[in-house]
Amino acid sequence: MSLRQDSGKNFLNYSKFILPVGAAAVLATVLGVGWYTQPDRFARGYQPEQPIPYSHRLHAGTLRIPCLYCHSGAPKSPQAGIPSVEKCLNCHRVTKTESPSIKMLAAFYTSGKPLLWNRIHTLPDHVYFDHRPHVNAGILCQTCHGEVQTMEVVYQNMSMRMSNCLGCHRSPGNALPTASASAKGPEHCYACHR
């Protein structure tokens, strides 16, 4: 056997076995490290501290203020939106005005500085989500955000991973009591990855 034939066999072994196995190992390592090091804001249970204490249990639960009163952007824009200080003061100009939290709220309003709430439900930058079709189809906020009306301090109830979205898109009956095949959400990549 000549040297030329021998080196050809080694190349075949390399390209048919070692190269694919090596590429798979590198890919698995990259995906594993990416999964493991994913920031907390994408994980279930994420509960950042907020600049002013706010009880969803009181407002959405006991007082039964609808989600869309404060998060009015949900039915008409991609983002649900965080209420402005002015929205809070619609009630708190006359209600609980001596509360330390309400005094802090009023101080933000007087100073003209924005109140920067820490976002709880966040998606990676490469994911596009539009609240409009979900809210307008009658999907309850609790489907993705959990029973917020029972939470003193809101936390991320479920992981905001693609598998959760696809679960509803493929079987909308879990989210929509009267779902039909036409109510299924799109499953193609561009629907969410833009």
Language model regions located:
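Sequence context surrounding c-type heme c attachment/ligation sites in exported
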Residues: 48-103, 127-194
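Amphipathic alpha-helical "stem/stalk" segments
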Residues: 106-109
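Alpha-helix-centered segments that form part of catalytic cores
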Residues: 111-131, 135
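Aromatic-capped interface at the extracytoplasmic side
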Residues: 30-48
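Glycine-rich, flexible loop/turn motifs
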Residues: 38, 48-50, 113, 125
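Hydrophobic membrane-insertion alpha-helices, especially the h-region
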Residues: 16-34
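N-terminal Lys/Arg-rich, disordered targeting/topogenic segments
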Residues: 1-12
